[in-house]
Design a protein with these regions (language model features):
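FIC/Doc superfamily catalytic core
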Residues: 1-167, 171-234
């Protein structure tokens, strides 16, 4: 089972803090790089690896490095670790808020309320409606006994449409997808930055062309499955 073998391997390697050539290192660096790229992070993949392995960074061709990009990369590593630890627990509003907090801790976004006022503490009508919508979505989702990849993608798309946070909804949603894949015995996946324009376009047109997003996720799933086989995880 994907749930048993892959999750156990990721947790084992996380505790051992393995680095090169193993699935935990691959997943951490690939997901942090690609998911942050969707949100405008400008660090290169080599720089992300350098941060993960050595907690250092070298500028590329004397190009200034945005400290916010570094913090967001480290935050993604920490949020991914938390996701692994609670992968088999039910998906709740508390978990979603914790993902968002970990991803944005110490960044400009955390302190600039006019740029990111999450529904966590905001009590205006928009935030109240968002919180209500999230709770309804979670209630409906958690009644499903056996979840399919289609169910997970459907949840993600509705989460994106509710857009509970002013910023970072995509990164939170992609962590949710990975967590729920592990929890449901489904092969997880990392959506690479190469799909960015195609992926973003289909996000905005999901009701008409949702089959295309499913194809992106299935292709990404096949790519991750190939990596797992290469590392002899499955």
């Amino acid at each position: 089972m994907v749930k048993n073998e892959l999750l156990e391997c990721l947790l084992r390697e996380k505790e051992a803090r393995h680095s090169n050539g193993v699935i935990y290192y691959y997943t951490q660096t690939k997901m942090a790089y690609n998911s942050n790229r969707f949100e405008g992070n400008r660090l290169s993949e080599d720089q992300v690896r350098e941060i993960f392995l050595k907690n250092t960074i070298l500028s590329s061709n004397n190009i200034p490095v945005d400290i916010n990009d570094i913090i967001k990369t480290i935050n993604h590593f920490n949020a991914f670790n938390y996701m692994l630890e609670i992968a088999e627990e039910p998906l709740t509003e508390k978990v979603i808020k914790k993902f968002h907090f970990l991803l944005n801790r110490g960044t400009i976004c955390e302190y600039t309320k006019d740029r990111i006022e999450a529904y966590i503490n905001n009590q205006n009508m928009e935030s109240i409606l968002s919180e209500y919508a999230i709770n309804i979505l979670l209630e409906k989702y958690n009644t499903l006994i056996k979840k399919s990849l289609h169910d997970l993608i459907e949840f993600y798309m509705q989460f994106e449409m509710i857009h509970p946070f002013k910023e970072g909804n995509g990164k939170v949603g992609r962590l949710i997808l990975f967590k729920e894949c592990l929890n449901s015995g489904i092969m997880p996946f990392i959506i690479m930055k190469d799909f960015r324009l195609y992926y973003k376009r289909e996000i905005n047109d999901y009701e008409k062309k949702k089959r295309y997003l499913n194809e992106i996720c299935l292709l990404s799933q096949d790519q991750y499955r190939t990596i797992c086989k290469y590392f002899q995880i499955i």
